[in-house]
Amino acid sequence: MDPRLYRLIRFPSNGLGNNNNDPNQQRGERPRQPHPDLGWILDAPNEPPRNRNPLLYLVTAPPRPRKKRSFMTTSKPFRIQTNVSDLQYNAWQAIQDAPPEKRCEYYVKYMDEHMNSQNYPNGVGLPHRWGQF
């Protein structure tokens, strides 16, 4: 740029506006230009403010793949084995559909129909005492 034109335009030396008390302009010198290799540093955007919120600047890792579950290792509900015979268990299952007021009658009818010599010949399979299968 032509120095005469530069003096006519009167560029501010430090970017703070038109400063007539600038010693460089009073002596007729050009303001110092930064070194050309430093241009890329001066043009760089400002860094984000530090220690404001450190969680905003954390780099999150990609999510880890979930472990595939095997049907052999998944837990199943444990069914408690009680001291109830198959006849008692089947009778209990049968009366679940009955209304609560008539469950006693349904139980008696079920035992009358199913606890007979056809289902249990010579009493084989019937419990001899409570808790025995």
Curated annotation (Swiss-Prot):
Tell me the disulfide pairings in this chain.
none
| Keyword set, alphabetical order | Developmental protein, Differentiation, Glycoprotein, Spermatogenesis
Question: Is Acyltransferase included in the keywords of this UniProt record?
Answer: no
Superkingdom in the source lineage: Eukaryota
Q: Which InterPro entries match?
A: Soti
The record's Pfam families line, in alphabetical order, gives:
SOTI
Q: Composition bias, kind Low complexity: at what positions?
A: 14-24
Name a single GO biological process.
sperm individualization
- What are the glycosylated positions? 83
Q: Where is this region: Disordered?
A: 11-57
Purpose of the protein: Post-meiotically transcribed gene that has a role in late spermiogenesis; required for actin cone progression during spermatid individualization.
Q: Which family does it belong to?
A: Belongs to the male-specific scotti family.
The identity of this protein, by name, is Male-specific protein scotti
Q: Which gene encodes it?
A: soti
